[in-house]
Regions:
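Charged, amphipathic alpha-helical linker segments immediately N-terminal to NTP-binding catalytic cores
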Residues: 1-18
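Charged, low-complexity interaction regions
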Residues: 17-20, 460
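Pre-Walker A adenine-sensing motif
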Residues: 22-31
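Short amphipathic alpha-helical coiled-coil/interface segments
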Residues: 26, 368, 474-478
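Globular "head" domains of long coiled-coil molecular machines
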Residues: 30, 34-269, 287-293
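Short, flexible helix-adjacent loops and helix caps
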Residues: 61, 206-209, 356-357, 456-463
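C-terminal end of P-loop GTPase domains and the immediately downstream helical coupling element
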Residues: 204-207, 213, 219-397
């Protein structure tokens, strides 16, 4: 257990001694603390959201058998047996019939459902839960309202009726629109726990037939977007959704590899002709019958091409035919590597996951503090507990993140945002202070003392309440750094 979790558990233990009612509250909050972080996947209609969710889970679950279920927020969580419940707006939970791993039908009208809770015994979601949403600017206004109600407005509702997300994966296919960026900010996240995904990377730019590899082009564009959106997202990762879904859901078979390999000798012009003409125009091949796939007729060739494009897209058709000669395993490995999902998953469970967990911890602190304003609980004792938590070095990053969120809302252009972000994101003394990795402990102490003086001078200026509070936490963080560096 990490130091933050230990500190929060100790605080909850103490909270539970105040009264039987607060003991129950502490146990409920502790359950939230122990659960894996929840990551919401958001994006516009046809942004590739469903294919990404399927790839991350490793099963085609985002596109359910019940069409109306795609218009409801769905939480995918690790657990057995495979089951689902509809959580209604009134807090009631109704079981949902699962057939062949898919939601067969909803037990209530969509407008009465808050969200669907789905448990799956799938190791791929053991480290984090996923929240799939109807999306932004969908075909109906109601769909976007459902997403907002559950993820934003729902925080003020009872816990049985709301979904608390700890981080967001934000999909877009070129450049995000202002309303999309605003929605992410409305979720209450910072750039540290918001991850951008440039979807459909395998068709970026000029596409599969362009002079430039679309995946390379997409990666360069993703780097540009990451710099432009640095105040909103941690980074931007290019993902080829169809390659991701196909390779991670076990769809590719040996037969698929064989029929794809039958096109290995065809030129790109052959394949274009087959797709465009229905195959008849290249019957007999273009220079020796290479496109025939061992004598297959034009119609059969077109069916093969369509099957391949349906599995791994045009990029896969044009780039992986020779790979297919080595069998389904090699083809699947190629698609996995090209998809971008391994890089995405690694980030989700490491650095990004750490920030999601810190966000969760901040939400727990705020929830403990909110208990003080209930008439049935001892206000002074709870507020004293929160005050003690603020001075706990193990929780300094949690309070820095809470301050970052508050400052972002009141003054997004203040220098404090850069200082707060650096202190939160840095793993070493040097990183937290913006120093080179080779900086000595003397350099660390000297720089921290200079920044401590700067923070003190800033606190003498006329600032917003959020900035005043942030400077107090920043000064505490610099003092902690000085103390720990001197002890090295």
């Amino acid at each position: 257990m990490d130091l933050t979790s230990i500190a929060l558990n100790q605080a909850l233990d103490y909270l539970g001694t105040f009264s039987p009612a607060l003991y129950d509250e502490a146990q409920r909050i502790r359950h939230t603390l122990d659960a894996p972080p929840r990551i919401v996947v958001v994006g516009r209609l046809k942004s590739g959201k469903s294919t990404l969710v399927n790839a991350l889970i490793g099963a085609p679950v985002a596109e359910t058998a019940a069409l109306e279920a795609t218009n409801v927020v769905t939480v995918f969580q690790y657990g057995a047996p495979d089951r689902a419940e509809a959580v209604l707006l009134n807090g009631e939970r109704l079981p949902i019939t699962i057939q062949r791993g898919e939601v067969a039908a909803l037990p209530a009208p969509v407008e009465e459902i808050s969200f669907i809770h789905r448990w799956m015994p799938t190791a791929s979601i053991k480290d984090f839960s996923l929240i799939d949403t109807p999306g932004l600017a969908t075909l109906t206004v109601e769909n976007e309202q459902r997403t907002r109600r559950i993820l934003i407005d729902g925080y003020e509702q009872t816990k049985a009726m709301s979904v608390d997300a700890d981080a967001a994966v934000f999909l877009f296919d070129a450049t995000p629109r202002m309303d999309e960026v605003k929605f992410i900010k409305d979720l209450g996240f910072t750039s540290l726990n918001t991850l951008g995904v440039l979807s459909r990377a395998d068709s970026f730019g000029e596409g599969a037939l362009g002079e430039r590899d679309p995946l390379d082009h997409a990666r360069q564009h993703a780097d540009t977007l990451a710099a432009q959106l640095s105040s909103s997202v941690l980074t931007v990762i290019p993902v080829a959704g169809l390659l991701a879904e196909t390779s991670h859901t076990g769809v590719i078979t040996e037969n698929d590899a064989r029929v794809m390999a039958s096109l290995a000798e065809a030129t790109e012009f052959d394949l274009i002709d087959i797709i465009a003409s229905g195959g008849d125009a290249v019957e007999g091949g273009n220079g020796g019958g290479g496109a025939n796939g061992g004598g297959a007729g034009g119609t059969q060739q077109q069916e093969i091409c369509r099957r391949v494009v349906g599995l791994i897209g045009e990029y896969g058709l044009f780039r992986a035919r020779n790979v297919a000669r080595r069998g389904a395993s090699e083809l699947n490995e190629w698609a996995t590597t090209k998809s971008g999902v391994p890089e995405l998953r690694q980030l989700l469970v490491t650095r990004f996951g750490k920030f999601a967990t810190t966000h969760r911890a901040g939400r727990i602190v705020k929830e403990i503090e909110s208990l003080a304003f209930s008439r049935q609980h001892p206000k002074d004792q709870i507020l004293n507990l929160v005050s003690t938590m603020r001075t706990d070095p193990r929780l300094i990053t949690v309070f820095l993140l809470l301050d970052l969120k508050a400052v972002q809302d009141t003054n997004p252009n203040t220098q404090l945002i850069q200082e707060l972000t650096r202190l939160i994101a840095g793993d070493t003394f040097q990183e937290k202070l913006g120093l080179p990795v080779t900086a000595s402990m003397w350099d660390v102490v000297n720089t921290a003392q200079q920044k401590l003086l700067w923070a003190h001078m800033e606190s003498l200026s006329a600032l917003t309440p959020a900035e005043d509070a942030a400077l107090v936490t920043i000064q505490r963080a610099y003092n902690d750094l000085i103390r720990m560096a001197q002890g090295q």
